[in-house]
Every structure is written in C-alpha cells, then in structure tokens.
Amino acid sequence: MSAEVIKCKAAVAWEAGKPVSIEEVEVAPPKAHEVRIKIIATAVCHTDAYTLSGADPEGSFPVILGHEGAGIVESVGEGVTKLKAGDTVIPLYIPQCGECKFCLNPQTNLCQKIRTTQGKGLMPDGTSRFTCKGKTILHYMGTSTFSEYTVVADISVAKIDPLAPLDKVCLLGCGVSTGYGAAVNTAKVEPGSTCAIFGLGGVGLAVIMGCKVAGASRIIGVDINKDKFAKAKEFGASECINPQDFSKPIQEVLIEMTDGGVDYSFECIGNVKVMRAALEACHKGWGVSVVVGVAASGEEIATRPFQLVTGRTWKGTAFGGWKSVESIPKLVSEYMSKKIKVDEFVTHSLSFDQINEAFELMHAGKSIRTVVKL
C-alpha cells in the first residue's frame, strides 16, 4: 500500500473541442477498494474523441480521457484482496462486482455497482484522485488511461498473463473485445451462416474476426471507404461492397446478393439510418441485427414494425457482452494462443507527447488503432 501522492504526466482535456494537453498532475493514493495502476500503453478510441468533441451528454471537463489501456498495479487500497502491487492488469470501463442483480444474471454484463459515480467522472466515494494546477480533474469511464498513473475501483480491473505485450493487449480493453463479443456472444453466429458488417473500422474488423472464428461461411463488409476493404479481407471478409456504387438502398443490394438477406448483420458506426439498413438486410424469419455502434445522444431508430413481426430480431451490445473481470484474462489467453488477432489492429505507435496526432490519424481515417506508449 502506498500513501504517497504521485506526480506524473497526463493528457488533460481542459475543455471540449480543444486538443488534450500534456500536464504534470498529482495522483492521490488509492482509497479502500481502489487500485493505483502505472499505465504502460493505451490506445485512442472513437469514444474518447466523441467526449472530447463536446457531443457526449455525460462529458464533463477538465478530464483525463482514455479507456483502452494496460499496465502494472503500483499499489492497492485497504480491503483489496484479489490484486497486489506488480500484477499485470487491464482497467475496465464496465466493472464486474459479482454481487449486483446484473452481475448475478447470466444474460448481461452491465454491472451497475458504481455506474452513478462513474458517469459523473468520480470514484465510488464521489471524489477524484487527480489534481492539476490546484484544480480537480475528473476521471473518465472509470479508467482514465491517458495518464502515467491512474486510480480505478478494484472491481474494474482484470488481472492478466504477465507475459502479454501490453502495447497490444490494451486493445482488449474496448474495441477488439466489443466487436469480437458482438459476434460470438450477442449474435451467437452459427457455422455456415452469412453475415454483413457495416463499418470497417477497428470494431467492425473485430466483428469480422468473431464471425470467422464462429464459422460463418460468407462475410460481407460494407463501407463507403474502399481503402478499408483490403484489411477487412485480411481479417476474414469474403467480399466487400460500397453503398455509393449502387443506385438502390444497400439493404436491397444485400437481399439480392444473399437470396433473401443475411443471417446476421452488425452496425459498427453509430448511424441510425445505417442501423435501419442493417436490420432490413436481414433474412425474413430468422435474421438477427446487432447494434454495436454508439449513436449521438438524442438519436432514435426507426423501421416498419412489419420487419420485426416477420421474424427479424434487433439486438444491442456493450463491450461485446463480456462479463469483464472474468472474461478479459481468457481473451488475453486466446490472443497468446493465436486464436484471435490483436497485433493486426495496431496501425500506428506514438509517444505520449504525440497523443493529439493519434486523434488526427483517427479523424482522417488513416488508422485502425493507434497505441500510445507512456
């Protein structure tokens, strides 16, 4: 246990719409049932950019963003029994307390134990562990991985194989796990099935990987950026199509291509019009469409009820349906045994001082995932 305040570098988002700023921050020691982690590597995700843009209704400033990280436990607070200094870990934005009604229900991974305070950018006791220039800095998604040291609740930490390369497995903290789980947990893709994936960014590629692992026989990638097609095929897409190449709605194109529609579709963008197209591209009688992308606040989805009456199912998923603390170590093991890909998602690697470039690469569509080494 450490009672010392640590001074370190962090990328602070002082206000919406402005680049993050590398600052010296003070990180208080962990309180009861908290863990202080030295972050070794973190990736930059669209969700971080969404909050930084000011569009996130839960977004508050100043804040230390980041939720796709990995590191080493530096110290633990009182009452922490399952973790110790030196453990290799991934911080989790969806915790797993193991006690709430959500954790006790096998149908969901949405632990609610600390949801209220986490949504306000605070630790479970309602306070922050970060200060900078005399000001309180908020936490983000219970993780705040854009800091050399962070403090998280002990129920928001997965202990992983110490041999795992942290600049790769940090991606299992969000995007790769989300897409992979959408296919294998939420949709439960069956061998021999036909799948369509809308949006071929990091999450969409992870869905393709999940469909491939599950044994799908035909995997169709859909994106308006044809530069993404080659990578999608590397991950297992059998073909890719660009909606802009057709004069008719993309759902009609897919229905014609697949003799009535796909068995499973996945929307990995966060666009409500595409969510509708993904549902309507599903086969009558049994097609399942999974919403993976996060739409902007206030958006609503629409379709004709007849689409559902005639046997299509609309589902949603968060973090791929994985119960986090117990599942992430298993996903790391699957990666270490080469059952799933992770390295192939990393297109760029930058130093901490270059973190704003990671956002620029993402906005320009030039990266899948950029890993920042701290």
Curated annotation (Swiss-Prot):
Compartment list: Cytoplasm
Residues engaged in binding Zn(2+) 2: C97, C100, C103, C111
Keywords, in A-Z order: Acetylation, Cytoplasm, Lipid metabolism, Metal-binding, NAD, Oxidoreductase, Phosphoprotein, Zinc
GO molecular function, a single term: S-(hydroxymethyl)glutathione dehydrogenase (NADP+) activity
Gene Ontology CC terms: cytosol
Broadest EC class assigned to this enzyme: oxidoreductase
Disulfide cysteine pairs (residue numbers): none
PROSITE patterns linked: ADH_ZINC
Gene Ontology terms: biological process: fatty acid omega-oxidation; formaldehyde catabolic process
Pfam families cross-referenced by the UniProt entry: ADH_N (PF08240), ADH_zinc_N (PF00107)
InterPro entries, per the entry: ADH-like_C (IPR013149), ADH-like_N (IPR013154), ADH_3 (IPR014183), ADH_Zn_CS (IPR002328), GroES-like_sf (IPR011032), NAD(P)-bd_dom_sf (IPR036291)
EC number of this enzyme: 1.1.1.1, 1.1.1.-, 1.1.1.284
Substrates-to-products reaction catalysed: a primary alcohol + NAD(+) = an aldehyde + NADH + H(+); a secondary alcohol + NAD(+) = a ketone + NADH + H(+); S-(hydroxymethyl)glutathione + NADP(+) = S-formylglutathione + NADPH + H(+); S-(hydroxymethyl)glutathione + NAD(+) = S-formylglutathione + NADH + H(+)
Post-translational modification N-acetylserine, affected residues: S2
Note accompanying the cofactor annotation: Binds 2 Zn(2+) ions per subunit.
Record-annotated site: Important for FDH activity and activation by fatty acids: R115
Signal peptide: none
Its job: Catalyzes the oxidation of long-chain primary alcohols and the oxidation of S-(hydroxymethyl) glutathione. Also oxidizes long chain omega-hydroxy fatty acids, such as 20-HETE, producing both the intermediate aldehyde, 20-oxoarachidonate and the end product, a dicarboxylic acid, (5Z,8Z,11Z,14Z)-eicosatetraenedioate. Class-III ADH is remarkably ineffective in oxidizing ethanol. Required for clearance of cellular formaldehyde, a cytotoxic and carcinogenic metabolite that induces DNA damage.
Family affiliation: Belongs to the zinc-containing alcohol dehydrogenase family. Class-III subfamily.
Entry-linked PANTHER family: ALCOHOL DEHYDROGENASE, ALCOHOL DEHYDROGENASE CLASS-3
Subunit annotation: Homodimer.
Protein name: Alcohol dehydrogenase class-3
Species of the source: Equus caballus (Horse)
Gene designation: ADH5
